[in-house]
Amino acid sequence: AYIKNPETALVRKQQGYFNYLHGIMLSQTNLIQAEKYFKKAIELGLNMDMDLAVAKLNLAGVALTRRRKLEATNLLNEAKKLDKQNMLKEQITMMKEQMKKM
């Protein structure tokens, strides 16, 4: 079933994941709109460091497309610290390579 009003239907952490998943779906089509959901998810809180790292990595990608290099660098470094199993190592390295070209 579709959640019509997440603020009243879900607890804070669930709202965080609701926004996180919404952001992931939107990142395929509309990065600018996805940015809003990722920021809200981080603000509300996510339980797993991995999820937080993915959200920050996506935000870094948005910052890069908008030519905000400093913000992208900070978000990438935060994502790298949160990525304890090195699952995002390849994506982080790729994004840092793209930054060098800017």
Task: For the regions a language model picked out, list residue spans one by one.
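N-terminal topogenic membrane-targeting module
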Residues: A1-N19, I24-Q28
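Amphipathic alpha-helical segments of tetratricopeptide repeats
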Residues: Y2-E7, K36-G45, N77-D83, M87
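Boundary/linker segments of alpha-helical solenoid repeat arrays
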Residues: A9-K13, L46-A53, K81-M94
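"A position-specific structural signal for the A-helix of alpha-solenoid helical repeats
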Residues: Q14-L21, D51-G61, Q91-M99
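TPR/TPR-like alpha-solenoid repeats
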Residues: M25, L44, V62, M99-M102
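Structural motif corresponding to the intra-repeat A-B loop/turn of tetratricopeptide repeats
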Residues: Q28-T29, L59, T65-R66
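Residues in the short coil linking paired helices within alpha-helical repeat scaffolds
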Residues: N30-L31, R68, L88
